[in-house]
Amino acid sequence: MSKETLVSTCNTESATGYVWSLYFYKIDRRSKEQPYKFYKVRFKNEDYLMSYAKSLMSCVNQFQIGPIESVQEYDGENTKVSCDKLVTDNELVAAQLTTFVTALGKASDEKVKGKIHGYVLFGVSQTDASKTITFIKSANPITSLTNKKAVVFTTTADDELEMFSDSVCRLYLNTDIVIIDKIMYTFNHNFEALFDIEKTMAKVKTAAIDQMLATTSFADPATFKTYASQYTSNRTFITLKEERLNRVRDKRKRKVVAAMLKIELDESGEFIIDSKEKAAHLIKYLCYKIFKDGETNDVLEASTINTLTI
């Protein structure tokens, strides 16, 4: 979905075409099977929720979607001028998102006790029940106006000041995540903690290293595996692609890659990986984090666009 389509979906006019519900959620990672707990929020006046939905969609459109330059596939390196997207069955989020949605479907009517970790505004199309839109905000909406920095009073019927100590609910006019049908759009990396994808990233890293080893392009596979396993950024491995794996499978193209990265080859034409640095450079290359500038021949790191000294 392009930015233009995202703009046309999130706007004040579209809000009236949905039936809206609001839910608070809590997270308890000690419960491994179902860490999420949802609570249905009810309003004294039903018009309040529609009013909030309109305001939220208007502000998201103007202040979050408007400034971005593009919508891109999630690669763990948001440039701050783009919106990331993932299909909801992406292995990074699929399992936890399913658990999240399952918990939402079993929302409780009980009064919330303890700290709230966030809330969900869920809309179902009035003309097509299969068409939905979901806004997720990872922030506690319940706050106290009286705190260490301020004391708050309210005016009584007798025009006197009385200390106001009750908690209030503050719903933000921005969002961390928008899910439209089967695509999840993220404006920051808060979803990584929400869906606990660090564990999933670790599995992606392990699978990626196995794919690299399967190219049979290493003089000492065990040494490369050791160095690769010590590579600290799991998110780098998200962008591993078959095209670059195929390059190092091909002995002729492997020589070009080795020359670019200053990695030696043995007599059989296999990579000699004898340091963490060389392993890191090859990993970054295979995961599209390193490329060669066609004009200057400088070797650049994609996430920072800094020339590497290798």
Where does each model-flagged region fall?
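Charged, amphipathic alpha-helical stretches
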Residues: S2-M57
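Acidic, low-complexity, intrinsically disordered interaction modules
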Residues: E33-A302
